[in-house]
Amino acid sequence: MFAVIYRWRVIAGREAQFEAGWRAGTERIAAEFGGWGSRLHKGEGGVFVAYAQWPDEAAWKHAMETRMRHSDDEARQKYRDAIEPGSFETLFCGPVLADLLDLKRA
């Protein structure tokens, strides 16, 4: 299992638009590139962070080579129009060494 953490700064007032684009895009990425899904977190000052899981590094790299260009153009445009230019960054990527999340409690 491979994990990636992303960070964005969203333009004030466009948070719902960003979340809608992110949500639809994440679903397409899972369907088209084999991603295992993601969790989105909202911080202060318009900062959003997502934690994504992939079956392996090769699957993630393949998706990144296409800039994760999935088939939902509307979702991609919502997402792009909501983020501050140049604010996207990959904070971390690497293999999962231990997984102690208890999803039964959620």
What are these regions (language model features)?
Residues L40-G45:
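A short beta-turn/loop motif at secondary-structure boundaries
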